[in-house]
Each structure stands twice: as C-alpha cells, then as structure tokens.
C-alpha cells in the first residue's frame, strides 16, 4: 500500500516540476503578436473558406495587416467587410475582386440531393463552418443560415449530389441601398 502512495507522490512531484518548467518556458519564450493582426482577424467572418487565396482567415489577416495585401478578397465578408477593413487600416476602399460591374454577387448556399446522398461524411469533414449535419450512412442536410457558399464541400462528394443554389432575396437578406432612399429632414424647434 505504501508503494502506491510513493508512486502517487512521485508522479505528483514530477507533474508539478513539469508544470513549473512549462510555465516558465511559456513566459520566457513568449512571442508577442501585433495587435492589429488580432483586430483584423476578429473582423473577418472566420469561415476559413480559402476564397481569398490564403488557407484561412488568420493568414489573410496577417497578409492584409503586415504585408499590404488587398482588402477586397474576402468573399463571404463582401463589400461590408471590405469597407470595415478600409476604415480600420486607413486605406482607400477597393472594388470587390472579380468583375468590377458586379458589386454584390448573389449569395449561394450548398444544397444536397438527399435521394443520392450515401452518408459518407466527406462533405461534413470539408465544411469549414460546420453547416452540414448528418451522420455516417445517413442523409446529410445543409443548414443554409450557416453556409457561406465557399463550395469546398462539392469536390469531395463521391456521388456529386451537392450543388450551389442561389438564395432568393427576402427582406431579411436583401442588400438595402440606403443611400438612394430619399430622406426628408424636418427641423424641430427646441423649447427651453
């Protein structure tokens, strides 16, 4: 019985020693990050879709903040994201990458033909935002509110049962152009 207590005490002392060494090492060798990179990364949609040409939002935030990369490459963020980045980084807004005439392309979401889905889960593994639900050997479904339309789930599908479909505009997702709506300003008298 005493051998068990000796083993427990020895392992506890060893764990404490390793904890102290790791704690010291984390403070001693800490790498300081640029706060602007953290702020830009927090502004990005975190879809990790790769449409910007970078493997995720963090590398794109580093490229925009430190290397002067174009701020118009975030597809899921769209024009609103580009304007926020321009304001944050004190640069001029740029037209969205792609066709200059198309300012806001129609939003697309993935759609699964459930009659052909075999439940292989390859699309679930490829989806960077977990917008596809389902389990092995069961039919999968896309949660359209979470889908960013990045099309990363289409190529791994062995039965080609996934396609991107445009979302019809509704009052909830319509891009309101508030600058073209006439506004009448009424002067109000103030009484003391």
Curated annotation (Swiss-Prot):
Family matches, as HAMAP family: RsxB_RnfB
PANTHER family in the record: ION-TRANSLOCATING OXIDOREDUCTASE COMPLEX SUBUNIT B, OXIDOREDUCTASE
Keywords of the record: 4Fe-4S, Cell inner membrane, Cell membrane, Electron transport, Iron, Iron-sulfur, Membrane, Metal-binding, Repeat, Translocase, Transport
Species per Swiss-Prot/TrEMBL record: Pectobacterium atrosepticum (strain SCRI 1043 / ATCC BAA-672)
Region (Hydrophobic): 1-26
Protein name: Ion-translocating oxidoreductase complex subunit B
Binding residues for [4Fe-4S] cluster 1: 49, 52, 57, 74
A Gene Ontology molecular function term of the record: metal ion binding
Broad EC category: translocase
Binding site for [4Fe-4S] cluster 2: 117, 120, 123, 157
Repeat recorded as keyword: yes
Residue ranges constituting the 4Fe-4S domain according to the UniProt record: 32-91
Annotated GO CC locations: plasma membrane
UniProt record, GO biological process: electron transport chain
């Amino acid at each position: 019985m005493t051998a068990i207590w000796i083993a427990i005490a020895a392992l506890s002392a060893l764990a404490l020693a390793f904890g102290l060494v790791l704690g010291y090492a984390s403070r001693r060798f800490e790498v300081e990050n640029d706060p602007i990179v953290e702020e830009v990364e927090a502004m990005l949609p975190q879809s990790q879709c790769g449409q910007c040409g970078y493997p995720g939002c963090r590398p794109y935030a580093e490229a925009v903040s430190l290397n002067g990369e174009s701020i118009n490459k975030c597809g899921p963020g769209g024009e609103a994201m580009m304007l926020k980045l321009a304001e944050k980084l004190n640069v001029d807004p740029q037209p969205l990458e792609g066709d200059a005439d198309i300012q806001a392309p129609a939003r697309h979401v993935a759609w699964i033909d459930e009659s052909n889905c075999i439940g292989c889960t390859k699309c679930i593994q490829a989806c960077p935002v977990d917008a596809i639900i389902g389990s092995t050997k069961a039919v999968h479904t896309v949660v359209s509110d979470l889908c960013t339309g990045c099309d990363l789930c289409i190529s791994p599908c062995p039965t080609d049962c996934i396609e991107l479909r445009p979302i019809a505009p509704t009052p909830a997702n319509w891009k309101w152009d508030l600058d073209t709506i006439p506004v009448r300003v009424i002067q109000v008298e103030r009484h003391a």
